[in-house]
């Protein structure tokens, strides 16, 4: 197996695992995973869309297509229970899917040796994680699975059957 194939596999499996549980929570998208709050499913999905937009920005210097969502879904934002504070679940999901598809197209256009290229503009404070094209794509899959745990905890809190 080549590195590119392994990265694509990780992106595909993590995406499937995430969207399955995200879709189960579409009717309870602002359910917090714990009584103390945390990252609810709508926030997770918007946050992941924002991170997907970091790939073209880091690798190609393009603007992040979800940058306007940073106040709602950025690393230092605080999830709130009011769904009216956010774009709709359908809008956030569509944006996430669109950006993931764009990133898969970018990955498909790369050669194996391209994966070792240094990222043009890695996010400030995340230079190590986004140091190369390959690492940048791999971070998406790993990051996605970290946040999937928040969604499964929210599902449990909402008592939505798996």
Role assignments for model-derived ranges:
Residues 8-12, 19, 29-76, 118-162:
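Short, contiguous alpha-helical
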Residues 24, 44-47, 109:
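Conserved catalytic core of Hanks-type protein kinase domains
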Residues 11, 15-18, 22, 55, ...:
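Hydrophobic alpha-helical core bundles mediating ligand binding, dimerization, or RNAP-core interactions
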Residues 1-5:
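N-terminal export signals and maturation junctions of secreted/periplasmic proteins
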Residues 77-117, 135-140:
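Acidic/histidine-rich alpha-helical segments that form the ligand environment
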